Amino acid sequence: MIQVLLVTICLAVFPYQGSSIILESGNVNDYEVVYPRKVTALPKGAVQLKYEDAMQYEFKVNGEPVVLHLEKNKGLFSEDYSETHYSPDGREITTYPPVEDHCYYHGRIQNDADSTASISACNGLKGHFKLQGEMYLIEPLKLSDSEAHAVYKYENVEKEDEASKMCGVTETNWESYEPIKKASQSNIPPEEEAFYQRYIELVVVADHRMYTKYDGDKTEISSIIYEIVNTLTQIFRPLHIRVALIGLEIWSSGELSKVTLSADDTLEAFGEWRKTVLMNRKRHDNAQLLTGMIFNETIEGRTYKSGMCNPKHSVGIVRDYRTRRHFVANRMAHELGHNLGIDHDRDSCTCGANSCIMSATVSNEPSSQFSDCSLNKYLNYIVRYQSTTRCLHNEPSETDIVSPPFCGNYFKEVGEDCDCGPPANCQNPCCDAATCKLTTGSQCAEGLCCDQCKFTKKGTACRPARGDWNDDTCTGQSADCPRNGLYG
């Protein structure tokens, strides 16, 4: 049994009201300095893990006590995760680093239903959390006292510049790619289709400008990408999409595709490189280029609308122009949203925040939420283009999840019948969130052949016909929808 470690942090808080300090996120005003004192409560004889599966931090923000609950993001890496860089003479070097005991967490604030947190615990606490609708950042201070941390509101980070920035996908060009083959009408109601789990196996590429920007420090670049993807996985959870990092590549010896001031040309070249090189080397669903290039026309990212699963068009490019990882994760989520058929938000779209993920202009305070319009667009996309987005159905096998099973992390792992998340978040009547077992009388909790907790009748169509092939049908013995030879 995995022991849950509860860590209580007692903090001495020293506010620096009106003062300014240069932190990793930039120049910050009005921050608080906190000194964590870690109290560990492990059962007698329990083994101390380097990075615990669950942690709890108690501290004060603006004089008020808060309790931060954290759980390790166990779906962050795939089993065959790899990292690739290049020697000075251009020779490819690929490694398979152990990632089981990583230090990246998701979390929430106790008694705040709308709270979120994305934290790295690798060297102190670093990341962001939302409390009472406001975004806070936390990071270790680079002082001789290694226990000192800074906590500050996102709004107190001085902006690099106030020029309006934008996504490169505009109304005049976002139809540049649409899947040619459209699925016939599904027998599955759209409201049910929205709740089926999908998966994006992601490769992130750091270009040579990123490599030189960070002085050739591959470890730092990798950590940056881990933080970005950790936030990315949290952003896509409401869409029932699990994002797993399957590969990371650093162009350490030079650019491997053309990177220019033109975002369009850069995207075109990167898509061609993905199709002809990367896909032959690494199985994945989507690739994102993180670049140090400053594009023309204040463009921060570019992609192909509805390009997901296409060999050349399931790509995006994102500029790494800020040290705030949450901001870059927001832009990458935005481009992935376009890949999934989502348009820019209109003025009438809402998400409960000042700005939403799919806003056409880049907000200085990024959102972590998709709007109501985005959710509807995504649902329309997956219903309309089922046959061309089948890569999203490639669920990792239970043995592909590299960490030990942990009930409540949304991943069905070895020994579990289901996993609908923590009890407070679970909305699946077929699954007991406390045990990750099926509820009494239930045969299944999810799947194309699961209806009201029971296996669908044998012969029921679960995936519509494609071309000359007949419908895929349920067996009556499983919640899975078996694929015919065309898609097997």
Curated annotation (Swiss-Prot):
> Which cofactors go with this protein?
Zn(2+)
Which EC number(s) does the record attach to this protein? 3.4.24.-
Q: Which PANTHER family match?
A: ADAM A DISINTEGRIN AND METALLOPROTEASE DOMAIN (PTHR11905), DISINTEGRIN AND METALLOPROTEINASE DOMAIN-CONTAINING PROTEIN 28 (PTHR11905:SF32)
Any further remarks?
The disintegrin domain belongs to the long disintegrin subfamily.
**Cell attachment site: where is this motif?**
466-468
Gene3D superfamilies for the chain: Collagenase (Catalytic Domain), Disintegrin domain
- Specify which residues bind Ca(2+) 2 according to the UniProt entry for this protein: N409, E413, E416, D419
Q: In which tissues is it expressed?
A: Expressed by the venom gland.
Q: Which GO terms describe its molecular function?
A: metal ion binding; metalloendopeptidase activity; toxin activity
This chain belongs to the protein called Zinc metalloproteinase-disintegrin VMP-II
Q: What is its main location?
A: secreted
Q: List all annotated glycosylation positions.
A: N296
Classification via SUPFAM superfamilies: Blood coagulation inhibitor (disintegrin), Metalloproteases ('zincins'), catalytic domain
Indicate the quaternary assembly.
Homodimer; disulfide-linked (disintegrin).
**Source organism's superkingdom?**
Eukaryota
Similarity comment text for this entry: Belongs to the venom metalloproteinase (M12B) family. P-II subfamily. P-IIb sub-subfamily.
Question: Keywords, A to Z?
Answer: Calcium, Cell adhesion impairing toxin, Disulfide bond, Glycoprotein, Hemostasis impairing toxin, Hydrolase, Metal-binding, Metalloprotease, Platelet aggregation inhibiting toxin, Protease, Secreted, Signal, Toxin, Zinc, Zymogen
* GO cellular component terms, A-Z: extracellular region; plasma membrane
Q: What class of enzyme is it?
A: hydrolase
Question: What does it do?
Answer: Zinc metalloproteinase-disintegrin VMP-II: inhibits ADP-induced platelet aggregation (probably by binding integrin alpha-IIb/beta-3 (ITGA2B/ITGB3)) and degrades fibrinogen. Recombinant disintegrin r-Cam-dis (413-488): this recombinant protein inhibits platelet adhesion to fibrinogen (IC(50) is 1 nM), inhibits collagen- (IC(50) is 18 nM) and ADP-induced (IC(50) is 6 nM) platelet aggregation, and also inhibits platelet function on clot retraction. May act by binding integrin alpha-IIb/beta-3 (ITGA2B/ITGB3).
Mention one GO biological process in which this protein takes part, according to its record. proteolysis
InterPro entries in the cross-refs: Disintegrin_CS, Disintegrin_dom, Disintegrin_dom_sf, MetalloPept_cat_dom_sf, Peptidase_M12B, Peptidase_M12B_N, Reprolysin_adamalysin
